[in-house]
Design a protein with these regions (language model features):
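Extracellular beta-strand-rich solenoid/capping regions of secreted or surface-exposed proteins
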Residues: 2, 61-66, 78-91, 99-123, ...
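Extracellular "leader-to-stem" segments immediately downstream of a signal peptide or signal-anchor
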Residues: 1-88, 99-105, 109-116, 122-138, ...
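Short beta-strand element of the conserved SAM-dependent methyltransferase core
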Residues: 33-35, 104, 146, 217, ...
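A structural detector for beta-sheet-dominated domains
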Residues: 3, 11-13, 36, 54, ...
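Right-handed parallel beta-helix
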Residues: 89-91, 96, 116-128, 151-162, ...
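Extracellular beta-rich repeat passengers
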Residues: 264-402
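Short acidic, gly/pro-rich beta-turn/loop elements at beta-sheet edges
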Residues: 20, 102-104, 130, 236, ...
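Structural detector of coil-to-beta-strand junctions
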Residues: 143-145, 167, 194-196, 216, ...
């Protein structure tokens, strides 16, 4: 934390452009600094009777909740503990010279009883670096920075540093017109399962920067609009993970830049740009449209696409795939994984069905490219395919407009 203004000289040395830092890297540590240019946020009026300026040595949990509607975190480091409860219509301002350690949750209530219309914003830091999470402790929601259900929540501007588990994991079960907004947020994550956002329903996610070590985005179940975001992965995870999607027609996912896409292991099923790696019998992938993704990394770990149907016991249920569209997804360079192991084979763009009755089907690739060439067929995209209904996989290219 700087208490005074300072000049910053930026000297880009190209270490990440010149060196693949994923599996097989044995070079020196590459230390990075990330600079963000934020808008000037309006600071709450500290003279207002219901605005509380919280000092670092004050315990937020001991405050009379009726005495404030807005908290301003004063400069310094604050520890709010785990699962600090947010109430209706509250505002929390984190300025750039404040660090808030802990996790912050709406009430674990649904529908009209969920916490409503709260705002957390500023250019400061929300940190989980002190939180210990055991890898097998998947049910411990208290270590997630944000979870449970909310309606009309507004999160904007701040950095979430070193999340201990899934970062933004709030659902929405109330008024569909009162959406949750995630805007200009930054995640700097290092741990296993440090996923970015699963907004579930009735949400907009835009202008965010996610450096995460698991899946960055989930499509959502209903009315989730995600656009103009930037992703960086070092170890694992897809940019977009498509789970069981009953009807994705009200969700959008578009305009994403992937500046680095690295992986610490090259033979698992996780880290791709678009992944539906674990469809199971009984699942659906219906009315999904993903568009405008650019992979800028000169040394990406993998090709862009991975789709797979896996067993679910002895289930004979079908897998429904209808109207799945991938449009304007471009990756200039081949996956580095092709160069580092001759025994396990080269990871490729992959479409892998389960059997003759449960195939990968009904996908359109529209104006996509790989290694600088249009994907106009399986060969051009260097696809591995098994149990694929090739008659329903369409590759469409249209001439560029002048």
């Amino acid at each position: 934390i700087f208490s005074e203004s300072a000049n910053v000289n930026v000297d880009i040395d190209g270490q990440l452009e010149d060196n693949y830092t994923g599996f097989g890297y044995n070079g020196p540590r590459v230390h990075t600094i990330t600079l963000f240019a934020n808008p000037i946020f309006q600071k709450p009026n500290s003279n207002d009777a219901f605005v509380k300026v919280l000092q670092p040595n004050e315990d937020i949990n001991s405050l009379d909740r009726n005495s404030f509607k807005t908290i301003v975190f004063a400069p310094g480091v604050h520890d709010i503990g785990l699962s600090y409860k947010i109430h209706n219509n509250e505002t929390y301002y984190i300025p750039g010279d404040a660090v808030v350690k802990g996790t912050m949750h709406p009430e674990n209530k649904w529908g009209r009883d969920a916490t409503k219309n709260f705002k957390i914003y500023g250019s400061g830091t929300f940190s989980s670096e002190h939180i210990v999470r055991h890898p097998d402790d998947d049910d411990n929601k208290s270590v997630k920075p944000f979870t449970y259900q909310a309606e009309g929540a507004h999160l904007e501007g701040f950095v979430i540093a070193d999340p201990a588990f899934h970062t933004l994991n709030m659902s929405h079960t109330g008024d569909a017109n009162n959406i949750n907004i995630y805007k200009n947020l930054k995640i700097l994550a290092w741990r296993k399962n440090s996923d970015g956002v699963n907004a579930f329903r009735n949400s907009e996610v835009s202008d965010c920067f996610f450096r995460v070590q698991d899946d960055a985005f989930y499509l959502g179940a209903e009315n989730v609009n995600q656009h103009h975001n930037t992703v960086w992965t070092d170890a694992n995870g897809a940019v977009l993970f498509l789970q069981n999607i009953n009807d994705g027609s009200t969700c959008t996912f578009s305009d994403v830049k992937v500046i680095y896409q690295r992986a610490s292991w090259h033979w698992w099923h996780g880290g791709r740009i678009v992944s539906f790696r674990s469809l199971r019998p009984g699942n659906k992938l219906v009315n999904v449209h993903v568009k405008n993704i650019l992979v800028e990394d000169p040394l990406p770990a993998f090709p862009s696409f991975y789709g797979r149907i896996i067993k679910k016991g002895n289930s004979q249920e079908e897998v429904a795939m209808e109207n799945v569209i991938f449009e304007n997804i471009h990756q200039l360079h081949d996956g580095v994984s092709s160069k580092l192991d001759d025994e396990k084979g080269k990871p490729r763009n992959t479409l892998d069905g389960l059997d003759e009755n449960r195939t990968i089907k009904n996908i359109k690739f529209i104006n996509c490219s790989f290694m600088g060439k249009s994907i106009n067929g399986f060969e051009a995209g260097n696809f591995f395919t098994e149990f694929v209904d090739s008659k329903t996989i369409k590759f469409i290219t249209t001439p560029k407009k002048n």
